[in-house]
């Protein structure tokens, strides 16, 4: 599992700003989504997790739009996104999130594959 190294910055008041990362990926990988939040947090990232991983819950179209809007706001607020792409799988929603992050010039890191630009690219 690739975990990117965060770069914290010192603020004028002496406090530290930890970089923010949004986790993206299919809810079929619930265990991996939960595990990666812990790994990223321990590495020093402030993590926005996937908001809903309970596949048994029925979500109507209006709620899907709301949840998508919230997730896009997480991406805009973040310094980067982290894609849980177990066995190379990236579904349609996750692909859309990657494109959205790229539109906002956010670096994209992959659980399997490292960084989008190839830096620190390593496989577990």
Where are the predicted features?
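Conserved catalytic or regulatory cores that recognize and/or transform ribose-phosphate-containing ligands
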Residues: 1-124
């Amino acid at each position: 599992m690739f975990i990117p190294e965060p770069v914290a910055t010192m603020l004028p008041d002496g406090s530290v700003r930890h970089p923010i990362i949004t986790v993206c990926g299919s809810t079929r990988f619930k265990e991996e989504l939960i595990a990666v939040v812990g790994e990223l947090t321990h590495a020093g990232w402030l993590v926005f997790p996937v908001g809903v991983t309970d596949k048994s819950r029925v979500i109507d179209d209006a709620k899907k739009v709301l949840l998508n809007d919230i997730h896009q706001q997480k991406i805009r607020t973040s310094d980067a996104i982290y894609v849980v792409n177990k066995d190379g799988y990236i579904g349609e929603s996750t692909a859309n999130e990657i494109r959205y992050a790229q539109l906002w010039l956010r670096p994209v890191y992959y659980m399997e594959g490292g960084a989008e630009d190839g830096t620190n690219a390593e496989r577990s």
